[in-house]
């Protein structure tokens, strides 16, 4: 079953209430569509990054890592085409003077018509049919004007044209300008990739949908350099491989789809792009992009060779040929992935209570590799004989995993607190533990319980948290 917009709202509220996500600068009224990640949120982010890095970089012998600067020489963005063509068409409402992306509103209109059984080409939707989402005025729009999405900054003591720089709108260009450095120092040759995780910035005119579209965001990108005749094959490979990554980490396959960009909507560098989309259930278009896998051809290395004067071709000694490699780029949004994992994991079911009845419980059925907290140690009560020994066990386990200790409140309520943040295992230290030197370990999803010797708890978790 696909998530609904009400579940998205519920998950957003849970994220804020449990400290996964806070509005940035909240005590000053907040910044629109800017978010800070709290104690649990930062753990979840780091776990997603760790799984991506392991799958894309360290588990392979044909990919290496890189961490490039956020502020690159301005010439990089001139050469890449971003200064000239990294634009979105904006229209302004003549009544309230709010600006919106024309293509987003056309797509939303077409999606609404589709729900009525009417097929409409978004590009053919006349702006006279579109109602302003801010003031409700219909069809009163200016002609579209291009709006460059790069954020400017100035280096140096005064703001001059010479000091003009940009905050990177993508991490990819830092990889391309280091292509020759990596080939030389890492002794790599095509097919090989360079992976990078880092922040990017885009002056989105209509950010929104919680953490889905923001001006500051993190990307997990990899540029895979190949011999040109093999590009199509490698493109298919990375589409399938990246789709499977989400499924392996617990996303319901029914909530994922592949969307191939029409030729007329491809980016200036692309010969073909396929998006991995998740069915968030947004109003208008329920699908949202998690990751794009593009065949960037040899555009990037060729243009940087031309503008820098540095040869970025590759000489294949075995075949005595020289070529400019094509690039296959899987580019994922970290916080979009985080949002999808949360929405897909959110579940409401029932659990037995101490009175013999059942209570509603909220569970995040996150893959244990992603769960912010791996285990919680819960003494049956706050007792002088129980809490110190339970704390000692938590301290021991904390050497290997992120482990919480909680002795406040009824044990059932403490279970619920851990369930709704996705903790896979709760370890109860009770009065019997003082005699049999064992604890009860409860599994999150099935709520099954197992008695395990205290000396074996670490091994018990190690088997079940492998890969975390």
From Swiss-Prot:
Listed GO biological process terms: glycyl-tRNA aminoacylation
GO cellular component, one term: cytoplasm
Ligand binding (substrate): 101, 170, 217-221, 329-333
SUPFAM superfamilies membership: Class II aaRS ABD-related (SSF52954), Class II aaRS and biotin synthetases (SSF55681)
Molecular function via GO: ATP binding; glycine-tRNA ligase activity; protein dimerization activity
Substrates-to-products reaction catalysed: tRNA(Gly) + glycine + ATP = glycyl-tRNA(Gly) + AMP + diphosphate
Entry EC number(s): 6.1.1.14
Taxonomy, superkingdom: Bacteria
Subcellular location per the Swiss-Prot or TrEMBL entry: Cytoplasm
Functional summary from the UniProt entry: Catalyzes the attachment of glycine to tRNA(Gly).
Family, as annotated: Belongs to the class-II aminoacyl-tRNA synthetase family.
Record protein name field: Glycine--tRNA ligase
């Amino acid at each position: 079953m696909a998530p609904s917009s009400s579940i998205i709202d519920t998950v957003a509220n849970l994220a804020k209430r449990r400290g996964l996500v806070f509005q940035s600068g909240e005590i000053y009224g907040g910044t629109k569509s800017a978010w800070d990640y709290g104690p649990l949120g930062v753990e979840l982010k780091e776990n997603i990054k760790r799984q991506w890095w392991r799958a894309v970089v360290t588990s392979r012998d044909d990919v290496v890592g890189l961490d490039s600067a956020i502020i690159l020489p301005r010439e990089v963005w001139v050469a890449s085409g971003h200064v000239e063509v990294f634009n979105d068409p904006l229209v302004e409402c003549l009544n309230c003077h709010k600006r919106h992306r024309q293509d987003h509103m056309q797509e939303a209109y077409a999606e609404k018509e589709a729900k009525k059984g009417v097929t409409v080409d978004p590009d053919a939707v006349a702006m006279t049919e579109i109602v302003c989402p801010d003031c409700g005025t219909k069809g009163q729009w200016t002609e579209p004007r291009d709006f460059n999405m790069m954020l400017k900054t100035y280096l140096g003591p005064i703001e001059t044209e010479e000091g003009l720089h940009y905050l990177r709108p993508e991490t990819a260009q830092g990889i391309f300008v280091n292509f020759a450095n990596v080939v030389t120092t890492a002794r790599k040759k095509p097919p090989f990739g360079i992976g990078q995780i880092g922040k990017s910035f885009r002056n989105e005119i209509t950010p929104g949908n919680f953490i889905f579209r923001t001006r500051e965001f993190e990307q997990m990108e990899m540029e895979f350099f190949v011999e040109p005749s093999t590009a199509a094959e490698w493109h298919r490979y990375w589409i399938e491989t990246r789709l499977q990554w989400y499924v392996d980490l617990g996303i319901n396959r029914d909530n994922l789809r592949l969307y191939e960009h029409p030729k007329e909507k491809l980016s200036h560098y692309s010969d073909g792009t396929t998006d991995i989309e998740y069915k968030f259930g947004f109003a208008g278009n329920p699908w949202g992009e998690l990751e794009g896998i593009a065949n960037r051809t040899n555009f990037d290395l060729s243009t940087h060779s031309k503008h820098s004067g540095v040869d970025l071709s590759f000489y294949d000694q075995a075949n005595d040929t020289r070529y400019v490699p094509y690039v296959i780029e899987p580019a994922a949004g970290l916080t979009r992935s985080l949002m999808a994992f949360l929405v897909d994991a959110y579940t409401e079911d029932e659990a037995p209570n101490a009175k013999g009845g059942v209570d509603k419980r909220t569970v995040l059925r996150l893959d244990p590799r992603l769960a912010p907290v791996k285990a919680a140690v819960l003494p049956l009560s706050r007792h002088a004989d129980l809490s110190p020994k339970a704390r000692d066990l938590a301290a021991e386990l904390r050497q290997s995993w992120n482990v919480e200790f909680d002795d406040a409140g009824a044990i059932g309520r403490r279970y619920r607190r851990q369930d709704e943040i996705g903790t896979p295992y709760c370890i109860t230290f009770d009065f019997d533990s003082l005699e049999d030197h064992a604890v009860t370990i409860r599994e999150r999803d099935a709520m099954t319980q197992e008695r395990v010797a205290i000396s074996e708890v670490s091994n018990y978790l190690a088997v079940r948290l492998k890969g975390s």
